[in-house]
């Protein structure tokens, strides 16, 4: 193990649920506005998960008022309050970039039984 791995190990979160691309998540993010802090929920489909260790990130996509919105979060970020898995998706790809081009029912992901 490298020296950096020992340093990174202290920053890893233990409360991260098991999720994969295709799953629908509620990501509760801490937002600081002035001197106030509040929790904002970002609900969407995981389209990718990449990296490893402290550098691991995932991207969540949702359609808000007809506009596609994607947000990339570090898995072990202190700005994430917690992550809820809403549904499990049944997909055959690790990166779901093709969802960007689909509209309506075509962009729907089958739920895993």
From Swiss-Prot:
Pfam families: Ribosomal_L19
Biological-process GO terms, alphabetical: translation
GO molecular function list: structural constituent of ribosome
SUPFAM superfamilies found in the cross-reference section: Translation proteins SH3-like domain (SSF50104)
Entry's Gene Ontology cellular component terms: cytosolic large ribosomal subunit
Keywords for the protein's UniProt record, in alphabetical order: Ribonucleoprotein, Ribosomal protein
Cross-referenced InterPro entries: Ribosomal_bL19, Ribosomal_bL19_CS, Ribosomal_bL19_sf, Translation_prot_SH3-like_sf
Function according to Swiss-Prot or TrEMBL: This protein is located at the 30S-50S ribosomal subunit interface and may play a role in the structure and function of the aminoacyl-tRNA binding site.
Family affiliation: Belongs to the bacterial ribosomal protein bL19 family.
Protein name, per record: Large ribosomal subunit protein bL19
Organism: Nocardia farcinica (strain IFM 10152)
């Amino acid at each position: 193990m490298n020296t950096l791995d020992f340093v990174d190990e202290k920053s890893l979160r233990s409360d991260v649920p098991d999720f994969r691309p295709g799953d629908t998540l509620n990501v509760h993010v801490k937002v600081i506005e002035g001197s106030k802090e509040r929790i904002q929920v970002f609900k969407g489909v995981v389209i990718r998960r990449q990296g490893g260790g402290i550098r691991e990130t995932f991207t969540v996509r949702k359609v808000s008022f007809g506009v596609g919105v994607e947000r990339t979060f570090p898995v072990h970020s202190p700005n994430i309050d917690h992550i809820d898995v809403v549904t499990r998706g049944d997909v055959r790809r690790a990166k779901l970039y093709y969802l960007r081009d689909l509209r309506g029912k075509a962009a729907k992901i089958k739920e895993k039984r």
